[in-house]
Design a protein with these regions (language model features):
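Alpha/beta enzyme core
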Residues: 1-174
Length: 174
């Protein structure tokens, strides 16, 4: 959301780690009791060592509580490595803004998409993620995933069936 909401970028890929660190530091000044998760930007977790280096830096410099990475099966080894190194990880599946090609659209309409979402959700859970964001996932598959896994699901346009919801103030106010 940082790139699109605050900078009016057409893609989140323009957001870099330095930008995320500065904004997360600012948020930390106001957030005292809530869990604060930093979104690792595109190309900052391409492999385990890069992910660990950038995650450690993010936690140290911002005093945030966890990192968020996009992807399921394709990032499971990175997630496992971070968790083994005591970095709490929030996963993110469904519509993944860092890798979306073309227009944003809901995910989980076809059997193939549904099966991929379930595989991704299970992979994140098995890798040790403490929760996952489901973005723009059809209601029935969000409900199925939420019942299937034991970690919390947080929906962004993914129905009332998730355990929690993300509400972007700028989206609400227009």
């Amino acid at each position: 959301s940082l790139g699109s909401v605050l900078y009016n970028y057409k893609t989140t890929r323009k957001v870099n780690l330095k930008m995320m660190l500065e904004h997360t530091k600012s948020v930390r000044m106001g957030v005292k009791k809530s869990l604060l998760v930093i979104d690792l930007p595109y190309n900052t977790y391409r492999n385990k060592s890069e992910a660990l280096k950038n995650s450690k830096r993010a936690l140290k410099e911002t005093n945030c509580d966890a990192v968020k990475v996009e992807g399921g099966v394709r990032v499971k080894d990175v997630v496992s490595h971070l968790v083994k190194n005591k970095i709490p990880v929030l996963g993110h599946i469904g519509l993944t803004p860092q890798t979306v090609k073309g227009k944003f659209k809901s995910v989980g309409r076809t059997d193939r998409e549904r099966k991929r979402l379930i595989r991704d959700a299970k992979a994140l859970e098995q890798s040790g993620a403490f929760g996952m964001v489901l973005e723009c996932v059809y209601s029935d598959i969000s409900k199925k995933i939420t019942k299937l896994i034991r970690i919390p699901t947080i929906g962004i346009g993914a129905s009332v069936h998730c355990d929690g919801q993300v509400l972007v103030t700028d989206d609400i106010l227009g």
